[in-house]
From Swiss-Prot:
SUPFAM superfamilies in the cross-refs: BRCT domain, HAD-like
Catalytic activity: O-phospho-L-seryl-[protein] + H2O = L-seryl-[protein] + phosphate; O-phospho-L-threonyl-[protein] + H2O = L-threonyl-[protein] + phosphate
Protein name per UniProt: RNA polymerase II subunit A C-terminal domain phosphatase
Function (record text): Processively dephosphorylates 'Ser-2' and 'Ser-5' of the heptad repeats YSPTSPS in the C-terminal domain of the largest RNA polymerase II subunit (RPB1). This promotes the activity of RNA polymerase II.
Compartments (UniProt record): Nucleus
Further remark: Present with 6550 molecules/cell in log phase SD medium.
EC number annotated for this UniProt entry: 3.1.3.16
Pfam family, one: NIF
SMART domains linked: BRCT (SM00292), CPDc (SM00577)
Amino acid sequence: MTTQIRSPQGLPYPIQIDKLIPSVGSYLHEGDRLLVYKFWYLVERASDTGDDDNEHDVSPGGSAGSNGVSPPTKQLRESIEFFESPYEGDLISWNVDVGDEVATANQVICEIKRPCNHDIVYGGLCTQCGKEVSADAFDGVPLDVVGDVDLQISETEAIRTGKALKEHLRRDKKLILVVDLDQTIIHCGVDPTIAEWKNDPNNPNFETLRDVKSFTLDEELVLPLMYMNDDGSMLRPPPVRKCWYYVKVRPGLKEFFAKVAPLFEMHIYTMATRAYALQIAKIVDPTGELFGDRILSRDENGSLTTKSLAKLFPTDQSMVVVIDDRGDVWNWCPNLIKVVPYNFFVGVGDINSNFLPKQSTGMLQLGRKTRQKSQESQELLTDIMDNEKKLQEKIDKEVKRQEEKLNHQLATAEEPPANESKEELTKKLEYSASLEVQQQNRPLAKLQKHLHDQKLLVDDDDELYYLMGTLSNIHKTYYDMLSQQNEPEPNLMEIIPSLKQKVFQNCYFVFSGLIPLGTDIQRSDIVIWTSTFGATSTPDIDYLTTHLITKNPSTYKARLAKKFNPQIKIVHPDWIFECLVNWKKVDEKPYTLIVDSPISDEELQNFQTQLQKRQEYLEETQEQQHMLTSQENLNLFAAGTSWLNNDDDEDIPDTASDDDEDDDHDDESDDENNSEGIDRKRSIEDNHDDTSQKKTKAEPSQDGPVQHKGEGDDNEDSDSQLEEELMDMLDD
């Protein structure tokens, strides 16, 4: 099997082949010179400096001015470079010839037959031939293998492995399930209060904490950059501190795995450390039968803020489902099933979320079934949200203090550390600070004071019971489609979105009192989440609004909706969550809120007037945008291209804007002159003697040498000089 050597990114295209060095049949080593290429570039040079430049000028400079000093001139210079072989092997054929122009990257230069493609490399050595392999020796981009940073495979091998995996899964009638850990299937905290309550039978939370597991890990020390003695030797590091983690498994997890495991091959993907992930895996999968070693952690992910299925399945994600409590870290990919976050240790949050983008507090913190809770519980919920906010403020304050120290160390360090970026150090500081703040502030103990002898921790979550049904339905849909004859191959990246979109189809939402003020609602998680299920959300009520979502029926928007359009359903947020977990639009009646005092007739009239003005403004704006789009899409070549060859150099009027007509007119004229210069060059090339005519195997260049725009007569002189230089170069 032959390997194509292609023109790489980063060369100063277009380039011209000047010489082919090895002949067909020659054996190439990695790094051997394949060919010589040349390219041209423009330089601006003052001709009165008298300096002796060793570089070859293709043409002489311009004429001197009246005062004896020549103005700066543009000169075309030629440069020659070598192109080296990235691979080892026998040269089978050349796909370019001397004189050919290569216009862009990724054009085939030649083909070789390699003794080994080095498809699998471990620790820098090929597992097939034993040779040391550089990154350039891969056929394509080297891909990291999950769980082992030393193992890499080529794109060719990844495709082969992907096909084999698909065949294996289909033979077993399985799909792939990627599982997040924190707040998806478990909740973890480091508050020492948990251990105290767990060991106190008289504590009201004792029974709820019976099945809480615990483990300990060494805290990762974030040492100062200058942590060394005066003689340059490292200081003795401080003693390692142990941190106790307390883990609550989401209710129904055992039944969930029993239902899902026969249908899915499961993988763990977490933004926690590998040590943490392995400990959690021991708790949720003590025998290792469910996940095995299929664990991807922050240590192997390559990103501190995002997750990507390409890390696990680089060539094909058509059989993959993801479950995670965060949609933003996945960029809301089509494979994602977002779950309601599991919040057992109230007020603690996700201890590993410091490595992820910050989330705004709001509706998602409420969770489900909040309408069934007592007034006292509602007050507690408010306290929980306030407590989380205060904890985050303390974390931010501590991180800021540490960052100032870090910035000072970076500023005074002669050489910054190469092993870690500032971003990585900052994230570690945030993580360390979050653990320390939770341990010292004991948020659970503070919240328990509100309830006295009543239990704070309630274990009534039922998310996984609904989720197992959803996953079973997706599995059935996939294999039903696969069994149909003459149908396109099923793809979960299409199946999952199509099932979701039916839930809130033709629903138009307005949220009241649930999204923090000043937030762009289109960037809010709940708005993005519901949009993946087919809903459209707007900040204000209009003629299309079908649902107003609020906890409080006395808000202005709720009162307005009641008066403006009685058909608008005013519902509690629990209705949204019930639809999301069931993947179907449930009846609104049990969640409908009663509005006792709608707005007055006068207020309604004022609103309708403002709404009418808003509608007129939107229509006017859309009309203007439509007109601009129509102008931009004018087909300038509908009547032919003869107008491009106008020898009188007439200016082309600008149709896009009347306000800046003069400026745009000048710019257009300059661009036309540049294009004409390039067209003349091509015309000269086309009429050149047959013996020296260029044969271009790759795409023709659309860009000539870059010319900086001058002013007035200087610009015309420069254009004339450039044309003379190009003609002299071609004559040579």
